[in-house]
Amino acid sequence: MSLTIAVVGRPNVGKSTLFNRLVGQKLALVCDKPGVTRDRRIHAAELQDLCFDVIDTAGLEEAGDHTLEGRMCSHTKAAINEADLILFMFDAKSGITPSDLNFASLVRKSGKPIVLVANKSESKAAVGVEYEAWSLGLGEPCPISAEHGLGLSDLRDAIMDAIGKERVFESKNAEKCVSVQSASVGDYVDDLEEKGSVCDESKQPLRIAVAGRPNTGKSTLINRMLGQDRLLTGPEAGLTRDSISVDWEWRGRHIKLFDTAGLRRKSKIQEKLEKLSVADTLRAIRFAEVVVIVFDATAPFEKQDLQIADLVIREGRVPIIAFNKWDLIENNSQVTLANLHEKCAHLLPQVPGLRAVPLSGQYGQGIDNLMENVMMMHRMWNRRISTAKLNRWLETIVAHHPPPAIFGRRLKVKYITQVKTRPPGFVISCSRPKTMPQSYLRYLSNGLRNTFDMPGVPIRISLRASDNPFAARSKKK
């Protein structure tokens, strides 16, 4: 059983900065503005020879249960219940506040081992605050600077003293420590793509990002999938800020779900924090294999919906549209759905055969249908076609509709091979590739989809000039 440590405290004391320091990556958004973190995030961490799971939490604030701050506080309390040890953090530069005193009492009632952490202790204003910190009743404070990485050795010793050496090293093993030192998101994706078919896909978690405009029900959908209120939800638009990953299992398949911040139009994004959230969402989309684009069924196909779908297609991820809030459609007949499918084909012609499913995240209707489509599309996205089959297909399709003549000379399409999967990528050898019309490339791309049963999958085709066997002879002359 792994050791779990929760980092808690009032807003803007540096919890997310310490979280990033412990996991060795900038996973959590960090900003001077208080209340940046809203959902709890868990990740494998390492502190010298200690391996554990660390939970970043929202700042504790005094508020009613039904307010946004109150709901955030309830998620932090859930993290306290999940943890084996609590790091209670306060701002040494600001000193002890009445809020610190109130929340210290809350943490003490949990009965969990607690380490009092005095962050920002590098500041001159922090001198003497350790005496004041005794008023919290949590023992001697451990001074650190999460931003500069100071005092982490003392923090490691404090954790050991609080929970005991036997408990700390109970679950330590080589595999976990190696996993903490894993590559960044981008390196991991590149590594998987280089391995291609050598990597056993069934043993890797399927990465699914849930994206869309603000307030389309992304977090509600994921909560329904998990069967618990894991993510913060509410009527307010733009609740999610960080891209939160959660583990899930569907019919025996391990899945990693990514909840993302809603993407607004670029012209409306002014604040630094929202820009950071958007960048985090874009990273999650690039890291994912399948992206479920959540449309509000009561107001589908807004301009921003189409731009998000186009972004996913350009990134080469598997796009699947989910018409959420289907329970609010009065006439949810097959005719309505057929009309929406027709609009999909008309407004998103980049990928013919795009999958679109109706569902209700609030009531759980249509989730199995969504996941069946996800699994099917993921298999297509990973498909590899033999060169012999491809060239037989190419010969047939070119004979049926030859390339056009450019400046009186007909283009010659000679050879095709698949060079990658995820998404499927093909190289075609032809004469004068720079003059190949885009319309003929679309013809070849759609032909590939139809013949090899890959509807709704982004396909990339590159053209390469064929070798001229007489080029060397002409140079000799």
Swiss-Prot record:
Residues 3-167, 206-382 form the EngA-type G domain. Residues 383-467 form the KH-like domain. GTP 1 binds at residues 9-16, 56-60, 119-122. It comes from the Bacteria. Keywords: GTP-binding, Nucleotide-binding, Repeat, Ribosome biogenesis. GTP 2 binds at residues 212-219, 259-263, 324-327. Disulfide bonds: none annotated. Belongs to the TRAFAC class TrmE-Era-EngA-EngB-Septin-like GTPase superfamily. EngA (Der) GTPase family. GTPase that plays an essential role in the late steps of ribosome biogenesis. This is GTPase Der. It comes from Bartonella quintana (strain Toulouse).
